[in-house]
Each structure stands twice: as C-alpha cells, then as structure tokens.
C-alpha cells in the first residue's frame, strides 16, 4: 500500500455522506484494492446521545458502516467510478470484539476480495490500539 494523507474534504469529494453520517476522517494508506482509514471517535458524536448517555459506546452497526464508507472512498476515488454511488448490499460473518468509546482512534481496513460486474465483496476489520474491535465481510453494488 502507499502511505497517503487524504483529509475529510477530499473524502467528501468521493462520498456523498455528510455530518452526522460521515464516519471517515482521514485515509492513511491506499492501494488498488485495499484502504486504511481513520475515524476519530469523540463524545460529540450524535449517536452517543442515546447509545448510551451514561455509558457511551459506538453502535456496532456504525462501526460496520464506517468500514463500508472507507471501502466506498476507495471505489469512488477511481476515475471510472466518478459520479457513481456505492450501495451497501449486505454483511456476513460480522463479529464485534471490543467496545469503541469516546477518545478512541478507530482504524478502518478494507480489502476487496471479489468482483463480479457491479458487485464487490470486501473483507473489513476495525481496530483500536491494535486490538480488533469488529470484522466482517461486506457486499457492495456500484450504481448510477
């Protein structure tokens, strides 16, 4: 992979997501079919208002969404996909191993393992301090 420093402004050029649903802050490594990105988790996240006010924990499905968005940055930054959208079509074999809380730096890693037409399958994992927080297999459909 190639070390890069793609900031949130550049990420928003690829992804249609915006606050409060943009869950990727920076891309640090990128290759043809692989990406590593960062989500800095803060107490100011909207979801912490209800999950849970006395014990804030990032919802697992939002960790998977952050991984999907990282993979989307990779796919939508390719010139041939400019102006298209990536639709999250499914997830399999998802495991949550560690709670993600305010102050954590969530490292998002996604690798495309299979493509067939507009459908792609990605192996993804999220870590905090080098420890696995979540992993799973994500399916995408490239559209529009």
UniProtKB/Swiss-Prot annotation:
SUPFAM superfamilies: Thioesterase/thiol ester dehydrase-isomerase. The keyword Disulfide bond does not apply. Pfam families: FabA. The keyword Protein biosynthesis does not apply. GO terms for biological process: fatty acid biosynthetic process; lipid A biosynthetic process. It comes from the Bacteria. It is an enzyme of class 4 (lyase). Belongs to the thioester dehydratase family. FabZ subfamily. Involved in unsaturated fatty acids biosynthesis. Catalyzes the dehydration of short chain beta-hydroxyacyl-ACPs and long chain saturated and unsaturated beta-hydroxyacyl-ACPs. This is 3-hydroxyacyl-[acyl-carrier-protein] dehydratase FabZ.
């Amino acid at each position: 992979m190639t070390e890069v420093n793609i900031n949130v402004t550049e990420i928003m050029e690829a992804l249609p997501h915006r606050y409060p649903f943009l869950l990727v802050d920076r891309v640090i490594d990128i290759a043809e079919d692989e990406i590593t990105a960062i989500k800095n988790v803060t107490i100011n996240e909207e979801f912490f208002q209800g999950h849970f006010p006395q014990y804030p924990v990032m919802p697992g499905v939002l960790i998977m969404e952050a991984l999907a968005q990282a993979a989307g940055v990779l796919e939508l930054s390719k010139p041939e996909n400019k102006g298209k959208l990536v639709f999250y079509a499914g997830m399999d074999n998802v495991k949550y191993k560690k709670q993600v809380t305010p102050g954590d730096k969530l490292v998002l890693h996604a690798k495309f393992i299979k493509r067939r037409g507009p459908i792609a399958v990605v192996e993804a994992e999220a870590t905090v301090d080098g420890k696995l927080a979540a992993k799973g297999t994500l399916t995408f459909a490239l559209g529009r």
